[in-house]
């Protein structure tokens, strides 16, 4: 990093992360990379002091990260990586405000990129069978656990629906369970 006020504050922040927050080495290395890149971006735009950074500049930086590539195959950055970079920059700006270096957090209105939630991977038939057969039926808790697993798999209820079931919801003669689903 250059010897600007901004780069000195970034180094102070990294020391703070090491001493005060005790971050793991890999996390600290990621923060260091992200901050170096951020300071270089700001310096290239003539910004040398934290007080010169505004929300538009932060958004421009995040857009530049989103548009860039990395690695030997020039892969684009994933949304999760862009989100992690923003998290590091946000922590830096919170530090700057906390230390009284700036009065306003330039990241406060910057929206985190939406990270897609991965779809769950369904269990195979053999995995479900082994799971249902796992409880020890010789114990009351084993019988309970087996019943829970049978209802979860056989009926397809949500956990919240299952935990809301009462004995009155069971009709053993008719062979059904009354479940009040989401939304009543």
Model-based region annotation:
Residues 1-184:
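Conserved catalytic core of the tyrosine transesterase superfamily
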């Amino acid at each position: 990093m250059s010897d600007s006020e901004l780069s000195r504050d970034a180094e102070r922040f990294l020391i703070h992360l090491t001493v005060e927050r005790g971050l793991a080495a890999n996390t600290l290395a990621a923060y260091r990379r992200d901050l170096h890149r951020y300071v270089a971006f700001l310096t290239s735009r003539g910004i040398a002091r934290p007080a010169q950074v505004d929300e538009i500049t932060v958004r421009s930086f995040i857009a530049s990260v989103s548009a860039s590539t990395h690695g030997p195959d020039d892969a684009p950055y994933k949304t999760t990586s862009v989100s992690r970079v923003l998290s590091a920059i946000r922590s830096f700006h919170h530090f700057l405000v906390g230390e009284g270096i700036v009065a306003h957090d330039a990241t406060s209105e910057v929206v985190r990129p939406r990270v897609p939630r991965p779809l769950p991977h369904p269990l195979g038939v053999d995995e479900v069978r082994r799971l249902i057969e796992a409880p020890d039926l010789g114990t009351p808790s084993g019988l309970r656990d087996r019943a829970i697993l049978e209802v979860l798999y056989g009926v397809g209820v949500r956990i919240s629906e299952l935990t809301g079931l009462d004995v009155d919801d069971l009709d053993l003669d008719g062979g059904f369970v009354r479940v009040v689903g989401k939304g009543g």
